[in-house]
Amino acid sequence: MRPITLIIALLLSVYVSCRTKEEWKSRSIYQILTDRFARTSDTGTCNYSQYCGGNYQGIINKLDYIKGMGFDAIWISPIVENTEGSYHGYHLTNLYNLNPHFGSEDDFKALISACHEKDIWVMVDVVANHVGPVGTDYSRIYPFNSAEHYHDYCDINNWSNQDEVENCRLSGLPDLKQENDWVTQTLCNWISDLITKYNIDGIRIDTIMEVPKWFWDKFRASAGVFQIGEAFNGDIGYVADYQNHLDSVFNYPLYYTIESSFCGSFYNLEGYWFNSRSRYPAPEYTATFVENHDNRRFLNRCNDRGKFTNAVVFSLLWEGVPVFYYGGEQYYSGGDDPNNREPLWDNYNTGTELYKILAKTHALRKKVSIWNQPIVQRYADNNFYAFTRGDVLACFTNTYSLSRTITYHEFSEGTKLCNILYDGDCVSVSGGSININMGDYPKVYVKQ
């Protein structure tokens, strides 16, 4: 049996190693809070601060719903055992046990298998900064059950003090001491074993700016798969430097710019474009998003479905790996945590306008390999923004019923371009100009 076991292990390692950052560049990620996306039985009314019953089998049952929008990767909640009530998964108690609220180990393996059968890659959320809220009773945590595994007790109060950010507690959570060689080696061994054992395709890493950068070099090497790190900060230079230590980071500077542009002025986006060009080591791998579980939903901040649709389509066509937060396709509008973590059951409507637009935009992404096309900004003012990627002209608005004439482009005279989102909407280059008439939704023109 040993030779067979060895062959299987080698095959699994080859499978995992195939998920390179270059391949991830072509993927589009649907973010799931495992406890809130789909359940297999009616567990009653959902208390947003407690477990509500979502599980791995529920996700399996709804993979066609995800696939129908065109997503080919999912990001799920941390899978390890947590303190009771920590439905989100960020409060570790046992590094080596799976969270039983989400299902058994067989259920988790079944999810991975079902996703791969449908060519959906799985990204698992992981935490290496902190453990659950146990004060100083470290005996409740395994294997980090001693005070020597943690930094001395202090709270982060000054986010401009990097030493404090890395060595003190986020929201009172015990802060792991990566300077302890055993702690670092344990975390690195764990992530390597986890990925190999379950055929995980990528990882999302929580709270990276609260951990020394040298640690991420080691963790990245041990993981061996694509990583996206969360540096919750709007400063481009600050966030971009973490991409020197991980494959990718969530593009929070762009996230804030998207809100200020689609709910304000596109001059903000124009400024971001010129300011960001040389900042990220590899902007094509950064994660582009409009919403997530840590912030109020877009429609809570800016209650306009047209603007939201414009922002979402922009995020799918802009450079980077798109990440879309579950429930957005149903126009969820929750406020601050936990109200932005609504259950999705009974709302799997495949007929919403955004569900259909997501499907069409994803089809275009794949047809033209949009990730390989350079971005050229073509027009920007307060209410209109346009860029091209190859033969695609993407036009966006943050208002209603406007007309613009684009003269800075590379399409030849007489070229016909048609909007892939709505049939019959075509324009042609005339006199070197392209006349665009916008409603309240984006227009994605493709050369015919």
Feature roles, as predicted:
Residues 325-328:
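Short acidic/histidine-rich active-site segments
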Residues 112, 116, 189-289, 303-306, ...:
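Active-site-proximal helices and loops of the catalytic beta/alpha 8
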Residues 20-28, 33-198, 213-231, 236-238, ...:
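Substrate-binding/active-site clefts of carbohydrate-active enzymes
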Residues 177, 300-301:
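Second-shell loop/turn segments in exported
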Residues 2-9:
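Sec-dependent signal peptide recognition
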Residues 9-17:
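Hydrophobic h-region of N-terminal signal peptides that target proteins for export
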